[in-house]
Amino acid sequence: VKQIPDKIREVCSKCRSLTSLVQTEYEELLHLFSTHCEEKMSLFTLKGKRRKAGKYAERKDSGLYGSRSKLDFLLMYLKEDTLQLRQGLLFEMSQSKVSEWLHFLLPVLEKSLAQMGYLPEEGFRFNAYQDTESEWFTADVTERPIARNLDKEAQKEEYSGKKKRHTIKNLVICDDQKRIVFLSDLYAGKTHDKEIWDDLDLELQKRNVLLDLGFYGTDVLEGVLPFKKPKNQELTKHQKAVNQALAQLRIGVEHAFSGVKRLKIVQHQIRLKKTKVRQQVLRMAIGLYNFRLEKRI
């Protein structure tokens, strides 16, 4: 197949199962994706070399002709985490060509989602002032499994005692509408949740952020944590009721993780080796989740 057949597109559930988007969402994303894709195709070759001056016209017998085929190719890869060899069989191209197209198209999708305003803030710094509508935030750490590193020292750093396997971590912050507004940089699986939190520069503008006991001990004034059971003692009924109420609010970030990991490329063990690409695919998965969330409220 060169693109998803029209008969499948007509069935909303089938389109969603292949791309994570319903048809109306897909068409809206395609409009902007096409603009950026055509612009990049006119300036650069598939290998990333700048084209010589002159008008560029895409050949109809090219591997992926038209923006619709390119978006289908990319969304299906992200949704199903397909082996590149299998993706090549589906789209009638070699594995090496699949790799070239992915490196070419991923930044195009990222640019489109950024222009639409669905990508989260990223890095070590978050300023809640830009999100003035949210009354409170929820923060948590998500882990993704990776292959065991050949380097023994790296193995120790990447081994998560909680998950009992090698992982990488990111801290995310959600607003009260379950929209993910911040994504931290990558951390090794050994890094404790509180250690990640303390490493970040967060300006919460006097708005509360709900945390779980993994962040116990943090000195952030806006942090709201559940009561911790004292050793050899029990929590009071009031403390249990407070913990239950906080858990009902904090569950929003877990729902957000579930929505992001609808894309299997951030759910399965990561085969991608480069840190930059590992971060990039999670950022785009969050962008697509925020896009779906806004359109389906």
For each feature predicted by the language model, list its residue ranges.
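Charged, often Cys/His-bearing segments associated with DNA-binding zinc-finger transcription factors
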Residues: 1-62, 297
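Short amphipathic alpha-helical segments enriched in hydrophobics
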Residues: 33-44, 81, 109, 260, ...
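Catalytic micro-motifs at enzyme active sites that drive phosphoryl/nucleotidyl and oxygen chemistry
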Residues: 61, 74-76, 158-162
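Short, amphipathic alpha-helical "recognition" segments used to contact nucleic acids or chromatin
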Residues: 65-80
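Short, well-ordered secondary-structure "scaffold" segments embedded in the functional core
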Residues: 84-297
